[in-house]
Curated annotation (Swiss-Prot):
InterPro entries (alphabetical): Elp3/MiaA/NifB-like_rSAM, Methylthiotransferase, Methylthiotransferase_CS, Methylthiotransferase_N, Methylthiotransferase_N_sf, MiaB_methiolase, rSAM, rSAM_horseshoe
Note on how the cofactor is bound: Binds 2 [4Fe-4S] clusters. One cluster is coordinated with 3 cysteines and an exchangeable S-adenosyl-L-methionine.
GO cellular component, one term: cytosol
Name of protein: tRNA-2-methylthio-N(6)-dimethylallyladenosine synthase
Highest taxon in the source lineage: Bacteria
Enzyme Commission number: 2.8.4.3
EC class: transferase
Gene Ontology molecular function: 4 iron, 4 sulfur cluster binding; metal ion binding; N6-isopentenyladenosine methylthiotransferase activity
Residue sites binding [4Fe-4S] cluster 2 per the record: 157, 161, 164
HAMAP family: tRNA_metthiotr_MiaB
Species in which this protein is naturally found: Neisseria gonorrhoeae (strain ATCC 700825 / FA 1090)
Gene: miaB
Subunit: Monomer.
UniProt main location, coarse: cytoplasm
Domain Radical SAM core: 143-375
């Protein structure tokens, strides 16, 4: 049985793709063993991210660490997948000639053949084409062990934000046909999955073809998935404010299985910066979406993404971002220092903000966000939360970890038979990034 080591960088789409890589290899070899140490593997895969510069360089650092393994075992297969693979292509082989296969997100289904071609010819294989929906046509049926699962409904992005490499590494937006998505979800429900997370670079751009040739939009998809037997909770990530329509907002009013959590990246509170980023909305328009959502789902948990130090960002514009964060009171958010990505329009903009100032802005924004997160968590003490038990706690192997409807992690004492089940937990303690709870006896 082939032993496979895989390291995944970046977004949840990459996590989904990594699972699919393991699936196609398992189907090819009649099963595989996933190992946690690279030196135990027959196949080593790095599923990469190019959104941040440090993530990209970390890949080459990791490749350097596995090079001695290749020297000891020439039959070892080393592969680079994901967005760095799409962006760099043949350059990866030039920089690390011991790499055997390089493939992009849309060609992961070809991995087994690429390995065979490498072993037959002795030549490294590179395939970073964009065959779009073909990828999903060649993937084996989803198999999961947990109570929650990701389902990719679309890939790529056509928004071309000035700072982002995704359109260049994953291609333009394309949607899976409606029936394909529903079949996968129904199959997962039959395996005991209770929570579905609909996945895409911009899920609210979903336009899936139906059997009659008509197009199903994202709001309609949510309503259909809501009726699939066995599915108790629905999430989605990631969405774009530009296409967050009233019909999607109304789903939060009408669909109780749609959880009270939304990740909606805004990136900045400054209209000038948003325009330079080519985001396609203003801070006021973003606030209007949030206002409508909270009017119909007051307990909605909101998270977002922010970039500080974008080229030309002034102190006043950063203060506008701080004010927006305070006004909206996000439950949680992720802040990044801008890093120019090769080939993007923003990479050509003059950037005269000192790195030390960017770090200061990062820390100042995180301080405000974390204070609000801690405050909201404190308000949950004493409440009873319906939770999906995900598995063993990452903090304490003697405890279990569950997730609330509003995406909070709760650690508690329980028994293994509770894993993948929905249970009620009373919140007893609150920390900045997690909660502690106890089982509510029936």
């Amino acid at each position: 049985m082939k032993k496979v080591f895989i390291r995944t960088f970046g977004c949840q789409m990459n996590e989904y793709d990594s699972e699919k890589m393991l699936s196609v290899l398992a189907e090819e070899h009649g099963g595989i063993e996933q190992v946690t140490q690279a030196d135990e593997a027959d196949i080593i895969l790095f599923n990469t991210c190019s959104v941040r510069e440090k993530a990209q360089e970390k890949v080459f650092s990791d490749l350097g660490r596995v090079r001695p393994l290749k020297e000891k075992n020439p039959g070892l297969i080393i592969g680079v997948a994901g967005c760095v693979a799409s962006q760099e292509g043949e350059n990866i082989i030039k920089r690390a000639p011991y790499v055997d296969v390089v493939f992009g997100p849309q060609t992961l289904h070809r991995l087994p053949k690429m390995i065979v071609d490498k072993e037959t010819s002795g030549l490294s294989q590179v395939d970073i084409s964009f065959p779009e929906i073909e990828k999903f046509d060649h993937l084996p049926p989803a198999r999961v062990e947990g109570g929650a699962a990701f389902v990719s409904i679309m890939e790529g992005c056509s928004k071309y934000c000035s700072f982002c490499v995704v359109p260049y590494t994953r291609g333009e937006e394309f949607s899976r046909p409606l029936n394909d998505v529903l079949t996968e979800i129904a199959n997962l429900a039959q395996q005991g999955v209770k929570e579905i997370n609909l996945l895409g670079q911009n899920v609210n751009a979903y336009r899936g073809e139906m059997d009659d040739g008509e197009i199903c939009d994202f709001a309609t998809l949510l309503r259909i998935v809501h009726e699939i037997p066995g599915i108790e909770r629905m999430r989605f990530t990631t969405s774009h404010p530009r296409e967050f329509t009233d019909s999607i907002i109304e789903c939060y009013r009408d669909l109780p299985k749609l959880v009270s959590h939304l990740h909606l990246p805004i990136q900045s509170g400054s209209d000038r910066v948003l325009s330079a980023m080519k985001r396609g909305y203003t801070a006021l328009e973003y606030k209007s979406i949030i206002r409508k959502l909270r009017a119909i789902r007051p307990d909605l948990c909101l998270s977002s993404d922010f970039i500080v130090g974008f080229p030309g960002e002034t102190e006043r514009e950063f203060e506008q971002t701080l004010k927006l964060v305070k006004d909206i009171a996000f439950d949680l958010s992720f802040v990044f220092i801008y890093s120019p990505r090769p080939g993007t329009p923003a990479a050509n903009l003059p950037d005269d903000t000192p790195h030390e100032e960017k770090v200061r802005r990062l820390e100042a924004l995180n301080e405000v966000i974390e204070a609000e997160t801690a405050r909201i968590n404190q308000t949950m003490i004493g409440t009873v939360q319906r939770c999906l038990v995900e598995g063993i706690s990452k903090k304490d192997p003697d405890q279990l970890q569950a997730r609330t409807v509003n995406n909070r992690v709760v650690n508690f004492t329980g028994t293994p038979d509770m894993i993948n089940q929905m249970i009620d937990l009373e919140i007893t303690e609150a920390y900045t990034f997690s909660l502690r709870g106890k089982i509510v006896e029936a």
